[in-house]
A protein has these predicted regions:
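Extracytoplasmic/secretory soluble proteins
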Residues: 1-293
């Protein structure tokens, strides 16, 4: 895509500069461009706030993932039919959400287990961290904290949560997640990060990319459309929030804050993708009520 970017990537080059050609490329062949999102995140536990308060959970006692076992035991005793910790049969598993390793594109071939202090590529699956974490999660599965059908579950965690069947999940914390989660599920979350500093790894720029198909009938036009989206607040708002006046209303134009119209909630909204981090450029779109302007 380097030639297409040089010719049509006006917005892309404004955002990334010449570094756009240094990511997602092999031997100088650029196969995609990264989306514009927060790069750093911190593994954290997200718990339904109403249940944390109901069972008097002291979040100050939660310092690391293993501390959640006592919490699960307490909440499960009062909510026996509820899943304590979300997991699915794809990459959205507790283990993957807790990992701070840099898989360098594919952890199967090796990873940086301590990227801030070492550039040594190690066997991810033979690491002490992997063994300890997998053992802990297996124990939780045996105790019923993780759903017995996790290996075949294809439901998104938001669907399970909106149905009232989920207490918590491990997820990457960044400033936008509290508002994003509440607006998409209808629940407030108590969040406990497990580290003080966020991490940035290779997937931060290659986890979600946008490309022009090799067999595109008109790659030039495809590139122009892609570049346009990166610079268009109107398109970004349409993709992420839907139609103004129907799916959302602007509450604070100066700070770009929106909310549901009267009578609309997370349960009955006609459209609310609310995953700007999956789209080309969330920084130019509106922010949901409760976000830091």
């Amino acid at each position: 895509m380097s030639e297409l970017i040089d010719k049509y990537g006006t917005n892309l080059k404004d955002i990334y500069g010449e570094d756009i050609a240094k990511t997602n490329q092999i031997d100088g062949f650029v196969y995609g461009v990264p989306n514009q999102i927060e790069r750093g995140s911190i593994p954290a536990i997200f718990m339904r706030k109403d249940l944390v308060e109901k069972y008097n959970i002291n979040t100050d006692e939660i310092k690391e993932p293993k501390d959640m076992e006592k919490v699960f035991e307490t909440v499960q005793a009062g909510e026996p039919d509820m899943t304590m910790l979300f997991s699915s049969n794809n990459s959205d598993t507790p283990l993957s959400r807790l990992s701070r390793a840099d898989g360098l594109g594919d952890a199967n071939t090796g990873a940086l287990m301590d990227q801030t202090n070492s550039t040594t590529v190690e066997n991810y699956f033979a690491s002490d961290w992997y063994k300890e974490t997998a053992t802990m999660l297996h124990d939780w599965y045996q105790k019923g904290y993780i759903s017995k059908d996790a290996g075949t579950n294809t439901e998104n965690w938001r669907t399970v949560c909106k149905a009232g069947n989920l207490f918590s999940l491990f997820f990457a914390y960044h400033p936008g997640t509290p508002v994003e989660f509440q607006s998409s599920t209808g629940y407030e979350f108590e969040i406990v990060p497990f580290y003080d500093q966020p991490i940035i790894n290779s997937s931060s720029y290659g986890g979600i990319i946008f490309s022009v198909a090799q067999n595109s009938e008109n790659p030039e036009k495809a590139m122009q459309v892609l570049d346009y989206i990166y610079g268009s607040p109107e398109v970004m708002n349409l993709l992420n929030w839907g139609e103004e006046g129907t799916d959302y209303v602007v509450e604070d134009e100066e700070n770009g804050i929106i909310n549901y119209p009267d009578g609309v909630t997370a349960d009955n909204a006609g459209y609310s993708f609310n995953c700007g981090w999956e789209l080309p450029n969330q920084f130019i779109a509106y922010k949901w009520d409760g976000s830091d302007p």
